[in-house]
Design a protein with these regions (language model features):
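C-terminal edge-of-domain segments
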Residues: 141-157, 370, 376
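A short, flexible beta-alpha/helix-coil linker loop
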Residues: 100-103, 160, 307-311
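SAM-dependent Rossmann-like transferase core, predominantly class I methyltransferases
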Residues: 152-186
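Flexible, glycine-/basic-rich loop-and-beta segments that form/coincide
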Residues: 48-55, 159-164, 168, 374-381
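Conserved S-adenosyl-L-methionine
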Residues: 175-294, 310-311, 317
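C-terminal catalytic and target-recognition region of SAM-dependent MTase-like enzymes
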Residues: 289-381
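Non-catalytic nucleic-acid substrate-recognition regions in nucleic-acid-modifying enzymes
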Residues: 2-139, 381
């Protein structure tokens, strides 16, 4: 069976979470770099990674890499790669994205244009064909340039993996599903411990936690670009892995996940999203202000993405809001709290000092993941 070098991009700062996920699936990690993890795998690995990985953004098949400081070197390097091993003569292929960091070549549109021409020339020479219809399956290509090293890869995913298919409606500034899942995995939370999100918004944190508790694979109900590539991945492989994933889900799991928001319309929206994800029955939704946050249970978790003041008038209310968060958390003396925000003065406003403060880039926005771990519950005798 053909082996691939697979690349899984992720949010900057969360590479260790993705590496652990890949290792848990049974695949060998080759390299961990800023914002991506490279691992070895076959066609089945492409299916498994797309369907099971919670923190990845997409799964790429590496075609090759080379050095290029000029567009001529880019053309020749691209032409030297074995495109014909992956793309059939009727395939529709193009460079969907080019990213350049610390490299001589930096114009995405020029990089895309030159590489497309080189790929066509390669295919012409190999297949002895002058014209390609490009009416078949899509083969989107992603290119990274880092310090003049060009890496070209086929995108097996298509629409980003954070699109699970359940979030048809969104509240303001929703957190990406794969980012929420990765942050939950950074905490010690498990399905036997209560989880509360007092700013649930679209419901992403509670829904992702419920999917983990029920062992629902994040990609089980969506499609992928590589499903149209039977010459590389047999259709039965997709079907078998989807079936395995569906059989492993446990919709009857007992867990205590609670989602609150001050806006009743937002709560209704979050509930609708949970219904789409098949986990509505696992989450208690309630219209509730953070100032009313209290709980009789011990050793619970607050995992949340509070408002961080996108507009100037909102920023003025942040000290008071975060002060209230700190006050309510202090009253929950055995609890743990994990929150992500771009508000730089969050600790000061809450009157708390985080045990850890991890910087995470959410797109181009620098955010902070504040971690306030509480005591561990006593072991059951």
């Amino acid at each position: 069976m053909k082996r691939f070098e697979l690349i899984a991009p992720c949010h900057f700062g969360l590479e260790a979470v993705l590496k652990h996920e890949i290792t848990e699936l049974g695949y060998d990690v080759i390299q961990v770099e800023d914002g991506r993890v490279t691992f070895a795998g076959d066609a089945e690995a492409v299916c498994c990674a797309n369907i099971y990985l919670r923190s990845a953004e997409r799964i790429l098949i590496k075609i090759g890499s080379f050095q290029a400081q000029t567009y001529e070197e880019l053309f020749q390097g691209t032409k030297s790669l074995p495109w014909e091993e992956f793309i059939p003569t009727d395939g529709r292929f193009w460079v969907t994205k080019a990213a350049s960091v610390k490299s001589r070549l930096f114009s995405p549109s020029d990089i895309q244009s030159v590489m497309k021409k080189a790929m066509v020339e390669r295919m012409k020479e190999v297949h002895h064909i002058e014209w390609f219809s490009e009416e078949g399956a899509s083969f989107p290509i992603r290119v990274f340039l880092m310090k003049d090293e060009v890496t070209a890869a086929l995108d097996t995913t298509g629409v980003s993996l954070h699109k699970r298919g359940y979030r048809k409606l969104t509240a303001k500034a929703p957190i990406a599903e794969n980012l929420a899942a990765a942050l939950i995995m950074l905490t010690p939370w498990n399905s036997g411990r209560i989880l509360v999100d007092p700013f649930c918004g679209s419901g992403t944190f509670p829904i992702e936690a419920a999917m983990m508790a029920a062992n629902i694979a994040p990609g089980v109900n969506r499609s992928f670009t590589a499903q149209q590539w039977p010459h590389l991945i047999e259709p039965r492989q997709w079907e078998e892995i989807r079936q395995e994933a569906a059989e492993q889900a446990d919709a009857g799991v007992e867990t205590d996940i609670q989602a609150y928001d001050i806006d009743e319309n937002v709560v209704a929206l979050a509930r609708a999203n949970a219904r789409m994800a098949g986990v509505e029955h696992l989450i208690h939704f309630q219209q509730r202000s953070v100032k009313d946050l209290s709980h009789s249970k011990k050793y619970g978790f607050i995992i949340t993405n509070p408002p961080y003041g996108e507009r100037m008038e909102e920023k003025k209310s942040l000290p008071g809001l975060y002060g209230m968060i700190g006050e309510r958390f202090k009253a929950l003396d055995s609890w743990s709290m994990y929150l992500i925000t771009s508000y730089e003065r969050a600790e000061e406003a809450m009157g708390l000092k985080a045990a850890k403060n991890r910087k995470i880039y959410n797109g181009m926005m620098k955010t902070y993941f504040y971690q306030f771990p509480g005591p561990k519950p006593p072991k059951k005798k």
